[in-house]
Amino acid sequence: MPRLEVSIRTRDGTCPASIFTPGDGPGGGKASWPGVIFFMDGLGIRPVMWEMGQRLADGGYLVLLPDLYYRTGPYSPMVASEVLADPNRREALMKLVRGLDRDRKVTDAGAFIEFLSSRPEVKGKRFGATGYCMGGNASLTAAGAFPDRFAAAASFHGGHLATEEPDSPHLFLGKLRGRVYVAGAVEDASFPDVQKDRLERVLSEAGVDHLIETYPGARHGFAVRDLPVYD
């Protein structure tokens, strides 16, 4: 079916979201699919996020793409080259990113889980989580906060995954029952080797099935097609 626009009630308001299901891909032709929460990157909802959501869905999933900036109201799709070249717009963007603290990420994730659990076309009670940039952080945060509800969690060039802050995502992953995949960039100051090693150690000690990779020559944002650093 085409992209379906829905509204999700959260503690702080109403979050608009898109649902994607398989089209003509290998996952099509079924009545229900495993659910995946797709956490957007810092530039927010825009056509490339919809494209990525549909591509993931075509692998055989129902994909939920929520607008994590719903608390600030509607906004026009952001163009990376324009936003990053304008100091004022860049700072406004970073304010949005910083506004998503752990408490908000966790309460939102709980609402998204409840929403997926209510959908008849979603199969099973354990879901997947994936995200890019700040969405990678949100993906691991959600999985750590609800360890029994996620079968897998992925982060692509997610930042600040294993910092020394008390709300760092790695501190809450010890009870996770699912698998974790982290793809980082060697040239990414938000996920340096010290964080990679710290995350590796925590997941290994907890016995969590995981794989962490960092790609030489890649930069933060390498996996999103409309970013200048896409590779």
Place the predicted regions along the sequence by residue:
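N-terminal cap/leader regions of alpha/beta-hydrolase-fold enzymes
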Residues: M1-D231
